Amino acid sequence: MKNKRENDYLIHRILEKIEGSSVDWRKEASGNRSLKIQQEDFNRAGKTELLEEARKLEQRGLIQIKWLEYGNDIEKITYRLEQAGQFYELLGLIPKWERLASEKEKIQTWSRKAQTGWLKAYYRNLEEALEKGKQPADLEKYGEPLFICLDALEKLKEPVYQRVFSVAVLGGTKVFENVLRTRVVSILSEYHPDVDEAMNDKEVLSQVYLEEYAQELAVKGNLRISLKGNEISLDRKSVV
């Protein structure tokens, strides 16, 4: 918004203040709030443009102006939280309460799929952040691919190579390694009950059966390998 001459400067400022509050962003919020007008606001919006916008908003019944010098200088404007939806409509934006409700619904969908305590706890913390009006960084930075990854990880029952997992679940051999690996390790370190501070990244991922090619895989049950036309049964150590 800096250095722009915008006819909707005041609306942006009002919504920034509303969304920056811990309570005013909620749909049921009510009461009057005020916004002091500084010289910086005139510099950014342009004095003529800001005064004109203020007059139009007052004519619509959306704000009240307290003048320092009538028609030339504004001390502050006052608005009602009950009318926040109208400010969003003027800009064609979705209200914060609707955006967060939509995000919460997505998280709840993934949470219902979760089978393990650690993953449920992770989703629960995301929900709590949204309820407080905070946008979790994981939603902005990683989004659905992270949740798809976590959902598949918690359901692994046997060891699998990271790149095999990545192509099967995320559609590319290096997506997990390049995009999600570091964050997944952090989540497991915080929430998984079998992970401790002494573990390195490889050991952490092993707790959910995700292995690197350099590591040895432990396989449950009988294993039969086809090699040059022969089948090798490792449980009996014989060629069949």
Regions found by a protein language model. Name each.
Residues 1-240:
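Nucleic-acid enzyme cleavage-core boundary/entry regions
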